[in-house]
Amino acid sequence: MTRTAFLLTILFLPTRMVSAQQPSDAQLRFFETNIRPALVKYCYDCHSVDAGDSRAGLLVDTRQGLLQGGDSGPALIPGNHADSLIWEAINWEGYEMPPSQKMPPEVIAHFKTWIDMGAPDPRERELLEFKTRITSDDIADGRSHWAFQTPEKPTGNIDSLVFEKLTEQGLQPAIQADAYTLVRRINFDIIGLPPTPSEIEAFVFAYERDADLAVRQKVDELLARPQYGERWGRHWLDVARYAESSGSRNTPYPHAWRYRNYVIDSFNNNTPYDQFIKQQIAGDLLPAKTDEEWNRNLLATGFLAIGMKHHDEKNPRKFMSDMVDEQLDTTTQAVLGLTVACARCHDHKYDPIPTDDYYRLAGIFYSTKTFYGTARVAQNHRPSDLILLPVQDAVASGVIGGRNQSQEQMKNQIADIDRQMQGVRGKDRRELRNQRNRIATKLASLNPDGTPKSFGMGVQEKDEMVNANILIGGEVDKPAQEVPRGFVHLFDNLNFTVSSRQSSGRLELAAALTSKDNPLAARVMMNRVWMHLIGKPLVKTTSNFGYAGAEPTNPELLDYLAVRFMEEDWDIKQMIREIVISKTYRRSSQHMDANHVLDPDNEYNWRANPRTLDAEALRDAMLVLSGRLNSERPVGSNSIGRPVAKNADQNNVHRSVYLPIDRDNVPESLSLFDFADPNITSTGRLESIVPAQALYMMNGDFAGTSAAAMAANLERKYSSLTERVQVAFHWVYGRPPTPAELQASDLFFRDFKFTSTASPTIRTENTGRPSDRSKGSRKRNGDRRGPGKRQAGPGGLVGDIELGPVQHTPLSVFCQTLMSSAGFRILN
């Protein structure tokens, strides 16, 4: 079945490509007699290279300058004077050129004739010449770097390859971790949530009978849960620099959440990694058997659309150049672990990647149209379309915002504005046009029956393919020679060629990136998987496998993992399973003095690496302990069509992966705990321990509310203080308390001085107790949860606590103390 992507044009003026037909002599004479003199007389002073001025980003001294246009878009659409901005400007319709006085009527008439005949213009921009310093011999020599060699599978397995390195270094492996430590580690690593007491008890029992079998069964159970995709999908969202706003002016991306959901579903469905990458680079070009598959492929290309954009950039060429650079940089770092974008302004300083290789790749993205879905409003000089999805999900996207209006009302408003614009010039006309654009955007987002359409961010092929010109120093006004679309010459073994002049090359790029002959794709991904499970990558520079990057601490192990990954048809779950069941993963984190002297940083994995819980796991664990976690996926996103509040995380009880991510306003519960920078590709999180984190855990509203809810659940389920204390340790630490901890707890309660403020109201659903607060209050507080599956807390209770002043009861303070401790935050 042939599938066509339906495009919603939201008030965006595209550039039309002109046929290559040569103008006739008569047409050129008309230009030289009537148009060139007028441009020189009326326009060159403000819009030419010789004058040293390009006001509003517009140059009119070459044909390319007119076609590319300036801040407001292409100035010239050959064959169509009515849609050409230069025609509007010389008639003083919204724009006024020249500003001092209008051109004579006969000159204006000449421009109409000239544009409608195809705008013949012999003036060509003089190109500079760029000469690379990197030779073919340099590139050939560069292939000797370890990362550019084809990985070869060594003899052995994970444990034998690790033990071989330990023996070489004179190190002894630590003992295996106890069952309590191991089940907590496995749970957080695979699903990002703590195990319940019943799960712990079952695992400990099974582990004592057959440790290997218990681990295998636990791993398989967790990999089958939907929470796995939420945990591991978030790892990829770091790489994909996922956010729901553009950065810079922070224009919202109302439909970014669809890409987020695609990623989570892909991990849960165990989509092979090579297919996962192909979908994100060229999903719109892949065959699809059903509308659902086509829908999924389109949403996958949101990977190229969700990056940071400078919407206040007035020069459209600069905006496009920066967007292409961001797409190219993200793609090459994410999949290849190479900093190809460093060759944008000059030859790469470390790797044999010449600047023309950068622009060979850039041509692929210049031939791709990006749909990121921001409407033309004040301060957004670069609006965009969206892709209308073939499968409508009836999600009330909220993109309309504000008060509801009927379609008829909006049509009447547009007609009224059109009438007002007829007698208005200058600034007032532009303001009316912006107002019209906003209303038209709302109207275009509705079906005829008034229901919202389903849109997605993504990319598609442009109507006309282009090759990129090398830009000297990366400057858009310093173009040099054109280079054909292609791939980095380092990988000539992949035999990359663009299949036709009508192809951007994205489909071929996707195939090259995931080819089993590509030495980097499998290595880069397996290095990250190892890092997420073991705590340290084999290659420290996770997004730079080039000459400036680090060498692997165990190259044989990295190659083993890479080859196994490809042998298993790029099955991520299988590789997670293989690593977690290994004895290397299952080691204790206990300190060994002799080993520490030889390998203080545990580079060779003689023990498990103690790690801090990342921001999402920490917040989600507190929601679980409080019994407040809503494990259902929310519909859409809270951020749709509106700015994200700094405290958006406070009332939101869904998993943290569903929190709205505003590039300039990340929720505090994430930003304080080393959340990935959403402006760039992040392939690993920092681990910091700073005072602000401790203050948040001890004094923050979210932590206090969670502790109060946990204490209330303990009080309802257990009658004695001794039971409550013992169970609290099981819930928070995943193990029973030690005698010393019980003694310290006894002293805590004996010495506690009671202080009180207003008490929160807690309702436990299984007791039927009503909340004192009204539903209206909840709505005013911004709770958008709606009905959903609430995940029971460790004790089996499902709590619902409203935010407010927290009563500092002895038990709630005790619970908050446990949550604030290293025993909770550190994963041993």
PLM segments and residue spans:
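Bacterial N-terminal signal peptides
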Residues: 5-16
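Hydrophobic residues within membrane-embedded alpha helices
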Residues: 8, 31, 685-688
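Aromatic- and Gly/Pro-enriched helix-to-coil junctions and flexible linker segments
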Residues: 18-284, 348, 368-539, 547-574, ...
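An acidic, gly/pro-interrupted, aromatic-rich
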Residues: 84, 89, 161-165, 266-268, ...
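Flexible, disordered linker segments and immediate boundary regions flanking tandem C2H2 zinc-finger modules
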Residues: 125-127, 590-591, 758-759
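Short hydrophobic alpha-helical segments that form membrane-spanning helices or hydrophobic packing faces
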Residues: 186, 198-202, 362, 737-747, ...
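Charged, solvent-exposed helices and adjacent loops that form client-binding or oligomerization surfaces
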Residues: 204-214, 752-770
